[in-house]
Amino acid sequence: MSREEAQKWLEAEPDEDMRLQLRELLAGDEAQLEGRFRGRLMFGTAGLRAPIMAGPLGMNRLVVRQTAAGLVDYLLRTVQGASESGVLIGFDARRKSHDFAVDTARVAAARGMKAMLLPTVLPTPVLAWNITALGACAGVMVTASHNPREDNGYKVYLGSGAQIVPPHDVAISDAIALFDPTDVEVAAIDSLLIQTLDDSCVENYLQWIQSVRLCRSVPAIKVAYTAMHGVGGATALRAFEGAGLSEPIVVVEQQQPDAMFPTVVFPNPEEPGAMDRVIEVARISGAALALANDPDADRLGVAIPVGASWRLLRGDEIGWLLGEHVLRHTQGDDRLVVTTLVSSSLLGKMAALHGVAYEETFTGFKWIADAALRHSDKRLVFAYEQALGYLVADRPLDKDGIAAAVLMTEVAALAIAEGTTLQGRLNQIAEQYGRHVTGELSVKMNPSDGLLAVDRLRSSPPVTIAGRVVVKVEDFKEANLLRLWLDEVGGAGVRLQVRPSGTEPKVKLYGEAVDMEPDTLQSLLSALEAIL
């Protein structure tokens, strides 16, 4: 059966690279062919993300066409006026991204829906911001974000500008399953329903970026920046200029988009070594901080000088700096700040002191957006997750690494104007709220083993961890997350959390404590790993 299916795919596949793969599979080992055609790539709240390869388990044009057909069918059935409001489509510079975007537009047009393509490779935040600005009923961003170079992905937003949450993901997945990937109708590329937008969509986003600034009377400072071979470079420079900030000193060899990411092992600012080049540029130039966007520019990494050396800020530390700045320089009883269960609880203390509503959500910005939409009487002014995702204004309802870079530069400039540094500001936050320490540990496991490991912990939680008593276990079943409190709940207690990753073959452990040495917290995470 797999051989017949592969032959059918070969006849329908429009991409010559994929056709070559299929020919090699058909000429090769039967078991490998069988494995490649066993099942299909499943659509979830994160959309699709997988290696670029032929067959139903990879990212390729037939899978994208099938996915687009299901998505458009769902929108036409559930959103009034969907065909007229249309779908907005963006793409990054990864391999096949433009092809996948154009195929999505052609599928939409074939089913009578207007399709709007962004004019060139652009950051994910530009796509997310323009969904509401243009009144689209949905948005599609073709990107694998900070995944390895072999991957690509397909991220879906609804008309609110927020990523999908259940039950939309299941309904869209069910709609996708109704289509044969080898037999999806596509319109001609010159269809009147397909429109390629001009640069005004970028200009309007950049105009909005100016409103992110909260304290304009701060001194100019030097900032080093890297786009990490992604699509953020040009937009980030324009954003800094429009916001009245000095032009960043860029890492030249990483500034232009390059699908091969030649100078980084993993194009993710969180990964060890990924920011080495921008830190070196910052050090040589005497910059006050080093900034890095991931390849689709929805995340922000930050490094700061401490004495004669530099250190990477943890995602929570960036969140504390941005959060305190926003809370200090905004007003109103209707303000709302949001973070996730696995991020630090310190933002909650900040919100309480400033009299601002606060909520914790499941992991992922889709849930942060969901919280903002549920609190329609509130104004979301800041949100973050510890994985370098930051929302610093009320739109878009997604993380924005470029807007965050602009505001972080302002935070650093204000600190300098007030006679301190970003490290000094963190010290002030610790004095005011307590010295929160956070840590993470990732354990590589295939997805099924990861689920089993968390289930075992759920059914038989430990009584002690490294000699410390487990006083409470909280089970967030919908998020598949377990929270274990050691010593006491809150206060001086230690909070350990465990969950299987939704996008990678690993189980993630998170820790937080107050007034504890980082090495001690890390040893507790290692002890929890041993129990897994």
Task: Describe the role of every protein-language-model region.
Residues 6-104, 196-223, 231, 497:
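An N-terminal, well-structured beta->alpha segment
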Residues 283, 288-289, 309, 329-502, ...:
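Phosphate-binding and adjacent anionic-ligand microenvironments
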Residues 13, 32-41, 152-282:
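Gly/Ser/Thr-enriched, mixed-charge loops and adjacent short helices
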Residues 88-151, 239, 244-302:
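N-terminal small/polar loop signature for handling phosphorylated ligands or for N-terminal nucleophile
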Residues 98-103, 128-132, 150-156, 184-185, ...:
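Short acidic, glycine/serine/threonine-rich loops at helix termini
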Residues 37-57, 144-145, 227-239, 382-388, ...:
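Conserved phosphate/anionic-ligand binding catalytic regions in large, soluble enzymes, centered on
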